[in-house]
Amino acid sequence: MFTNDTDDGRGQVGIGTLIVFIAMVLVAAIAAGVLINTAGMLQSQAEATGEESTDLVSERIDTTSAVGTVSTHVADGEDGADRGDLAEISIGVTGAPGADDIDLNETIIQVVGPEGQENLVMADGSNDMSEAGWDETSTTDIGSTESTDQGDTDDDVNASNIESGYFAVENEDGYFVEGSDAVLDDNNGELTIVFNPKVAPFGEADDVSGITPGDLHEDDVFGAGDEASVDIVSPSGATTSVELNSPDLFSEPGEAVRL
């Protein structure tokens, strides 16, 4: 009825307790290590997310206008478009307030239009523009080799020269620029993104160089009553969406209409 504790028994109990205590310490240490590693990973992810969020704000593009220029020629005329069609689509862009420099040459524009969906990149040089009307001595030409009087070269290159899969960029003087100059910064307060309404996904044409006068008719070119969705994706991934809605009727050839 009485417990007879011996020195050996008490020693065994003490060793067992010590082993349990050591095991508990090891488990606690491992758990602490896991918690520390998890906290470090969460902190790194939070910092990365914060940087991405900052980039999305600091590299966001704002739009100032969306305009279409009504064709001045009938379907069998010089620009191959009917008077119910547009000769040019342009969107004015600036950097959002507080934005860093934004390179439009690294910007992708996703367009869903009457003739499908395409990702467009900036035309930077004559390879991305139709040879028709190309004048290597004109400063209105992207990638020109010599400078001449810009006032005499307005008709050398325009939106109708932009090939499928590309957009062009105009400066504030209305002239196309190379990729190195297509940067929204303190020097370029506003630039204009220009699309060719004849080529996909706005129009039916796939190759500008293959278009001859009279080939395109009212249903072939983006024009009256047509709609398109444009997503401008900056190099950081910030997206600016624009809905283009062409009026049902155009009043005057050559007029600018709000889209």
Curated annotation (Swiss-Prot):
<comment type="similarity">
    <text>Belongs to the archaeal flagellin family.</text>
</comment>
<feature type="compositionally biased region" description="Polar residues">
    <location>
        <begin position="136"/>
        <end position="148"/>
    </location>
</feature>
<dbReference type="InterPro" id="IPR013373">
    <property type="entry name" value="Flagellin/pilin_N_arc"/>
</dbReference>
<dbReference type="GO" id="GO:0097589">
    <property type="term" value="C:archaeal-type flagellum"/>
</dbReference>
<feature type="region of interest" description="Disordered">
    <location>
        <begin position="237"/>
        <end position="259"/>
    </location>
</feature>
<dbReference type="InterPro" id="IPR002774">
    <property type="entry name" value="Flagellin_arc"/>
</dbReference>
<feature type="region of interest" description="Disordered">
    <location>
        <begin position="126"/>
        <end position="157"/>
    </location>
</feature>
<dbReference type="GO" id="GO:0097588">
    <property type="term" value="P:archaeal or bacterial-type flagellum-dependent cell motility"/>
</dbReference>
<feature type="propeptide">
    <location>
        <begin position="1"/>
        <end position="11"/>
    </location>
</feature>
<dbReference type="Pfam" id="PF01917">
    <property type="entry name" value="Arch_flagellin"/>
</dbReference>
<comment type="function">
    <text>Flagellin is the subunit protein which polymerizes to form the filaments of archaeal flagella.</text>
</comment>
<keyword id="KW-0974">Archaeal flagellum</keyword>
<dbReference type="GO" id="GO:0005198">
    <property type="term" value="F:structural molecule activity"/>
</dbReference>
<protein>
    <recommendedName>
        <fullName>Flagellin B2</fullName>
    </recommendedName>
</protein>
